[in-house]
């Protein structure tokens, strides 16, 4: 019974109308703000969720459980001012199928949380230019969004890909506000609210990271 339920990939909990080639669940636009930001790994112990937002700019293993057991965390996340959609990794050296699956999981959880009253802020992620075919599917236009710059300036190619994706995000989504986790590159445009990064993503790349 347990194994059978796991094989549903959460489709037994909710089915959402999808968009784009891969049927990505749609996230509604948000205009939420947070007085302070903490990583999901500190959310359970947070004593004042009403003045905090939760981000997922962490190593994936620290939050994979929100996908494995989504109902366990809904009530907790609903207490926070805002919750970013989970930043499942889209490394350029990941197989394309894995990248698309991670984008899908991010959106399924965002739509599921919104359905249950969580104040969701879309996290925008991309890898290389080929990912532009699907990585903005399901994202709202004119919304507050969250982006992480952590690890994107480690070399020229990573910096180039981050800029290409950022500018494509501006063109397609026209975000109202951009919550930028990490250093803000001097070329970045838009209504940016910087958030200092206390956790960094550490990973030994197979080829290159974004």
Predicted regions, residues:
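SEC14/CRAL-TRIO lipid-binding/transfer domains and related phosphoinositide-recognition modules
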Residues: 1-92, 108
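Eukaryote-skewed repeat-based solenoidal scaffolds used as protein-protein interaction platforms
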Residues: 41-48, 66-207
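Internal alpha/beta domain cores that form substrate/cofactor-binding pockets in large enzymes
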Residues: 210
């Amino acid at each position: 019974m347990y194994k059978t339920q796991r094989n549903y990939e959460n489709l037994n909990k909710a089915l959402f109308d999808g968009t784009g080639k891969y049927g990505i669940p749609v996230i509604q636009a948000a205009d939420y703000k947070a007085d302070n930001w903490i990583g999901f790994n500190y959310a359970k112990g947070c004593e004042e969720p009403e003045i905090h937002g939760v981000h997922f700019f962490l190593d994936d293993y620290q939050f994979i459980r929100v996908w494995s057991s989504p109902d366990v965390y809904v009530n907790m996340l609903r207490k926070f001012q805002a919750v970013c959609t989970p930043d499942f990794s889209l490394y350029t050296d990941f197989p394309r199928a894995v990248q698309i699956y991670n984008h899908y999981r991010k959106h399924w959880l965002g739509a599921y949380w919104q359905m249950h009253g969580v104040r969701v802020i879309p996290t925008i992620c991309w890898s290389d230019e080929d990912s532009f075919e699907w990585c903005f599917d399901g994202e709202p236009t004119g919304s507050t969004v969250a982006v992480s710059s952590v690890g994107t300036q480690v070399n020229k190619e990573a910096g180039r890909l981050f800029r290409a994706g950022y500018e494509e995000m501006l063109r397609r989504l026209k975000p109202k506000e951009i919550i930028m986790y990490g250093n803000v590159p001097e070329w970045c445009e838009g209504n940016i609210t910087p958030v200092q990064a206390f956790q960094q993503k550490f990973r030994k790349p197979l080829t290159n990271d974004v």
